[in-house]
Amino acid sequence: MKKKLISAVAVAMAASMTLTACGGAASSAASTSDNTASEAATTEAESSEGYQPMKIAFAAQAVDETFVEAKNALENEIGPALNIEFMFSEAISDNGALNTFIENAYASGCDAVYTNVTGGIDQAAAVCNDLGMYFVGISSAGAEENREMPYYVGVAGASAEGYGEAYANALNAVIGDGAEQSILILSGAACYGATSFVEATAGSLRALQDIYGLTYTEDVNALATSSTQVDAENDKGIKITVCPGMQDIATTVSPLLQSGDYDVLVGTSNIYDSLGVAVDEVEKALGKDIKFITRSMFSDSTKAAFNSTDSQGSQVIDAIVLNGTYEHLAAVMMLRNAFDGHADAMRDGDHCSRVPGQIPLVVTTAEEYNALSGDDMPFSFVTVDEVVGQCNADATFHSIDELGASLTTENILKKFG
């Protein structure tokens, strides 16, 4: 899905290009074209007025749809507004490739780097510090060990803690009426300690605790991080099963669904592509509706699922938890401010600030999905004006964090509705 940022700059430039392309028009049209082009140039100049030229490199762990959306937004909208040139890597799979990219970025005149390469934050911070380039890592945890580095700014991390809240909200939306259901939770990489999966699984278990007023016989975190399939036994006798793993999900889960024991399927990873067909077949065979909650992203398959009904006449997917992308904007805002002499405002007292980013969005209806995925929505639901408003001497990592925290489904739909 192509996102575009809403800005006077983009509108003016688009109008200019349209009018200028009409060669052979009357002199009045040519005059209008000249005036529009002049106004667009003036607007663009004013939008980046006061910002010294800057170059930022992004070291990407994957080159996927989110990467393409971020690249388009940064190059075409954010960059011109903040006077920033961007440099992008290919997919980086190891620390050696990460180091090489950072060194190439330095040779290309970059002033700063940010990365979302898992496990590479500390090493990248050290290399950037040695080269005199400001650095922000995208991570779900802070990095206090880097706080003595003068060029280490902080962490702009997807809110791992927010996954617990997001999954709780999804479950409340789908089964919050308290009618007894049996639930199968696919905990994904929680057994390996992956924070967002642990939080998503634990948040789901706590939500069920609240919905049914039950008490587990075992610690919630122990259940969430179990490396083997485990029943979350409780005093209400409600069947809740936690199933770990990321490989061969269909092989593992299909027999469980075919047993007819489960009414609700919760995936802490994107399970629709691998289990959508299996769930549909079980629903047809057993004549029952299985509620489907999954982590997902904006895509053609997700859109089709939200706008289609299954064999039981229900929405194919009942709720999705959407990964946030605000950390890209947060990283750029933090680096712009650091480069402009406001690095301390981007750090807390211990020199190791973390901007958690937006809580993952929960979408439960086709109407919500279609509105949020529309082409007129800005990248990460933040306008250019809002980004510019966080790049000045008054901005702090707290104000950047607050902007991200405001990005809930309800607020976004109200803001752009």
Where are these regions (language model features)?
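Hydrophobic core
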Residues: 13-19
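A residue-level marker of the well-folded mature domains of exported/periplasmic proteins
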Residues: 2-4, 22-417
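Positively charged n-region of N-terminal signal peptides that target proteins for export
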Residues: 1-8, 12-13
